[in-house]
């Protein structure tokens, strides 16, 4: 990840990649015995290197009363899977007054992910309160800080992924990590530099990794430049 993006991933990104790319074990989906499955480091690495082409890995921020929408194109040859993971704020401590496996919600900032296609909404996995039962994909998950939506047989078409939240976000915002696999794209741009603050007479150089499949031409254009600013592009920077 450091070699590709020039930065170290957050803990939530590492956790999200590990859960997202794990090989399923035990019951279908997450379960109390195997969790998200068996770690697959090769698939996690391939998800990082394919970022922007057949996968998406990013670190995002959600503000109070905000929702964020991503429109992606599924390859149609493998499941479309989208996951969000976040490091939640500390909740109320369990001082031993709760029974084992007590279902009382401990989540502080409750984020949500949905995938939509036309009028159909796809929900994330949710563990059943009965530990021996399989996880379900038919209702909201208000318990976990890892949410994953999986469409086993998507079509080669566009799907809308929406990230939102319920209730009040403590501190007014919540960082989260997004991982998506099962995508197709003809090119990608992955930033490798941070935000810059410069004076009006200075140049700002933003670097990125540009990847392209096929022989088509990609045209870049700047949007929202300050008055008097001029932008130029090459294969590695703006």
Q: Can you say where each PLM-predicted feature lies in the sequence?
A:
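Hydrolase catalytic cores
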Residues: 1-28
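C-terminal edge strands of extracellular/lumenal beta-sandwich accessory domains
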Residues: 10-16, 68, 100-107, 114-117, ...
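Acidic glycine-/aspartate-rich tracts in secreted/extracellular proteins
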Residues: 23-26, 87-89, 119-120, 168, ...
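Short solvent-exposed strand-capping/beta-turn motif centered on an Asx-Ser/Thr pair
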Residues: 75-77, 87-89, 166, 199, ...
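Short proline/glycine- and polar residue-rich coil/turn motifs
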Residues: 62, 138-143, 152-154, 200, ...
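Secreted peptidase-domain scaffold signal
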Residues: 37-109, 178-189
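Surface-exposed beta-strand/loop patches in noncatalytic accessory domains
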Residues: 103-143, 231
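Long beta-sheet-rich domains in secretory-pathway and surface-associated proteins
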Residues: 173-238
